[in-house]
Structure formats: C-alpha cells, structure tokens
Amino acid sequence: MERNDIQKISSETANIPVYKQSAEYAIEHDELPAYRESFRVNMACRDALESAIHESYHDYCLDTGKAAAQVAAQFGMERVAYVLANTVRAFDHDGRISRDNKAWAQTVPVCTDADEWGHERSRYFLVSQVNPGLVNLLVSRVREELAREKDAPAKRSSVLEKIQKNKAAVQAKAAEKKLPGQER
C-alpha cells in the first residue's frame, strides 16, 4: 500500500480501535480483518505524525501542541501514543530520545509481531522520516496531554446547569399539559 493511499483514509476508518495482538493471534481467533484495519490505520497515523512534524517545524522550533492536537483529532490519543511508543522502543539506542520517554514507551503494551522471515511488522509504522530529536519533543508533549487527560476530573455539571435543565424540562411538561383555551 502506497503512503498516498494510506493518507486517504476517511475519518470513519481512523476511529478503528488499536489492535494490540499479533497477526498470528488474529488468525487463530478469526480477528484478521480487525488486525489488518488497525495495522493500516497505524501506518496512516505514522504518515500523519511525520506530516504534522514537518508542517509544525519552523525556524528551528517545533510547535508540539499543534502537531499533537492535529494528529490526535484525526486518530485519537490512544493510537498516537501507541505509534509513538513503538517508535521510541525501536530507537532505544538513540541518544536523541530522552530516558524518560524511553521509560514511558516501555509502559505502553506493544506486542511482538514477527512475520515468517522474523522481521518485526511494527517496523512498518515507525515514525522514521523525521529527526528523532523532533520525535522526542512530540512524545514529551503527548505524554503531557495523556497525563492531563488522566488527571482531569470528569466534567461535572454546575448547579446552574442542573437548574436550567430542570427548568426547561418543567416548561416542556407544562406546555404539553396545556389544553386549548387554557392559554394565559
């Protein structure tokens, strides 16, 4: 599959859940279509990450917020983290990736998925067409966003919102109960 074909993935297909098992497992459990779709979207996410880094890098500065938000909006933070963790694991030897990011990548479950020749299939969705130092900056930002999502309490409705919703419900019921000729 060509990179241009992968970029044509619709937003509907980009919402496919991350399949975290190997192809062998998928075959054994009749889940091969789910594996293939997830793999295809992982490659599209890789391309989107590389494009976002290229587009967000100006004057020796990477706008990590813009790049992360752009790709997360299209693929979801779980897939972005999965693809980036896979990339960092593959570049474990590279000094341009921080120790903290390397340690984080080890906490993200990525299965071993070797093909019949012993090559790791996850290598197909490595973010490798940009400088690893820029990938490191983006990984740090994604980790911050993940921590923010995790620490943010679920949005609770305010008392005013509850009163307004209740008032609207009461008014709707009252309007239904009014009989013709009883209008004031």
List where the protein language model places each region:
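Gram-negative host-targeted secretion-system effectors, predominantly Type III and Type IV
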Residues: 1-183
